């Protein structure tokens, strides 16, 4: 549902830390040299790189995702490969090797490579969620900010693996925010779309901190011009499809995917770490660099796909954590429950017209809320372990939670192989329970509880074992003491801010006081 893998695979995803570190140009202000945090016995060449250099290397070697991925439009690259009669993966690898194409992470401030539009949903990115608030304001928004350090300071570490351009300020052309609170991000947004709050919409709610699934249910209709999250995004999809049908149409897209956990790819670089960028090896998709897949996209049909269940759940399967199971029966059930689309690319497929339809799709397909699906998922895991695990859900095999059920009363979920605890009247939920008692391998490369990380970079940075490390001096406060006096004595405080359960997030902001 979230990544539309019922219609297209693989999805294009990104980790927020790498994305915002690069595009808010925080790397320009780094004053801590890598040599200051390396282990004494580290490879001497490691100290020649900066923090952003390591991130760029990790992205191009396939350890991290990238956004954007390549220095050219991936739709155009797909066309070029087709015109040349070459497989897209081979075409991209060849151009990366001869230098005519580069990864976007190697040139983050190229106007072709930095973000222009940002849609923020229910996240206070510019308040407390994004770390480095002042850098977001300066480099993404180009507005008043409190950046106190000078990016041209001679103490700032200069990268050697990426292209350094004059700093771009105000990279974003459009910031759109969906929220029911007037958050800090809303205050800075170009467009704020007021969305329905707790009692104005239908939705699902759960947590990894308790074993129940419960609803948000519409008690009153959204007020004034407010719409629910589902209706807002459905509206986006509809208008975009109307415009894209003529402007973009049907195109093929080259998608890069990192070497994924719970897949054979994570064993693809077992010994020395070789960087194809430096000619240490060839760029081999899925082994020494990200995997490459061509995905056909019909941009004029996005709305029709948004409002219907895609065919891949029947043609391929549903999956998670390296397991896969058949879902034909569940999709057929959704046809009867939600009805079917009468026309378009989703003709004959189950409808997802309303938020409740979407909730029913999730409840029907998830092993946590459908006992029959849970049994198939446990059987799939059993094929890998050689053991029968289905006894874990004998008492709940026929459980099938519907949205109306949780509206009446929150329901306890079914034991699922996606997690490592069990839902039981005799055993409290405890992470790792099935690994110990069902002899299921731990999700590590060795299949065992693993405290030693045998990776060259981890060893070089002294992070191969979890041991005490003193605090790192980031060299950010000393030069500022006395620079902006306010008549009061200045002190520097170092706060420990663990994230307590059931707590608010305000403490993630305003933690440095002077």
How does the language model describe each region?
Residues 1-225, 269-514:
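A cross-kingdom feature strongest in bacterial/archaeal respiratory oxidoreductases
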Residues 1, 249-264:
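A glycine-rich phosphate-binding loop feature that marks nucleotide/adenosyl-phosphate handling sites
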Residues 224-228, 232:
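A short beta-strand-to-alpha-helix junction
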Residues 229, 241, 258-260:
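Charged alpha-helix within mobile-element recombinases
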Residues 231-246, 250:
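Non-catalytic, well-ordered alpha-helical segments in soluble enzyme domains
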């Amino acid at each position: 549902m979230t990544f539309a893998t019922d219609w297209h695979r693989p999805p294009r995803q990104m980790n927020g830390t790498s994305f915002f570190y690069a595009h808010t140009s925080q790397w320009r202000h780094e004053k801590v040299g890598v040599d200051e945090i390396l282990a004494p016995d580290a490879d001497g060449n490691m100290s020649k790189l900066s923090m952003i250099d390591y991130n760029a290397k990790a992205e191009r070697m396939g350890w991290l995702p990238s956004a954007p991925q390549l220095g050219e439009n991936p739709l155009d690259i797909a066309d070029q490969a087709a015109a040349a009669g070459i497989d897209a993966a081979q075409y991209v690898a060849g151009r990366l090797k001869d230098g005519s194409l580069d990864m976007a992470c190697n040139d983050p401030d190229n106007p072709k490579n930095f973000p222009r539009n940002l849609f923020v949903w229910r996240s206070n990115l510019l308040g407390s969620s994004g770390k480095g608030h002042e850098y977001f304001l300066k480099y993404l928004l180009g507005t008043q900010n409190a950046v106190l350090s000078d990016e041209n300071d001679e103490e700032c570490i200069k990268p050697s693996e990426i292209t350094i351009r004059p700093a771009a300020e105000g990279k974003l052309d459009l910031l759109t925010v969906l929220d029911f609170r007037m958050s800090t991000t809303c205050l800075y947004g170009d467009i704020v779309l007021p969305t329905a709050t707790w009692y104005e919409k239908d939705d699902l709610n759960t947590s990894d901190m308790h074993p129940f699934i419960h609803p948000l249910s519409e008690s009153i209709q959204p007020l004034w011009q407010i719409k629910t999250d589902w209706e807002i995004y459905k509206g986006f999809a509809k208008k975009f499809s109307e415009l894209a049908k003529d402007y973009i149409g049907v195109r093929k897209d080259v998608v890069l995917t990192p070497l994924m956990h719970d897949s054979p790819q994570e064993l693809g670089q077992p010994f020395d770490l070789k960087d194809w960028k430096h000619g240490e090896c060839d760029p081999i998709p899925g082994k020494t660099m990200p995997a490459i897949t061509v995905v056909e996209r019909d941009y004029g049909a996005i709305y029709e796909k948004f409002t219907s269940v895609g065919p891949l759940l029947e043609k391929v399967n549903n999956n998670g954590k390296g397991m896969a199971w058949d879902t034909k029966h569940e999709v057929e059930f959704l046809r009867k429950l939600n009805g079917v689309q009468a026309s378009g690319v989703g003709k004959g497929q189950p409808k997802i017209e309303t938020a409740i339809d979407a909730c029913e799709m999730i409840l029907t397909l998830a092993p946590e809320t459908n006992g029959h699906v849970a049994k198939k998922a446990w059987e799939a895991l059993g094929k890998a372990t050689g053991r029968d695990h289905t006894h874990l859900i004998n008492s709940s095999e026929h459980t099938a939670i519907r949205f109306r059920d949780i509206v009446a009363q929150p329901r306890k979920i079914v034991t699922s192989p996606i997690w490592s605890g069990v839902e039981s009247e005799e055993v409290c939920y405890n992470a790792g329970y099935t690994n110990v008692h069902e002899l299921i391998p731990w999700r590590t490369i060795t299949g065992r509880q693993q405290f030693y990380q045998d990776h060259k970079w981890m060893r070089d940075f002294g992070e191969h074992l979890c041991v005490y490390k003193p605090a790192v001096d980031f060299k950010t406060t000393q030069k500022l003491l006395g620079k902006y006096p306010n008549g009061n004595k200045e002190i520097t405080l170092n706060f420990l801010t663990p994230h307590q359960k059931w707590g608010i997030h305000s403490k993630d902001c305003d933690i440095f006081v002077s």
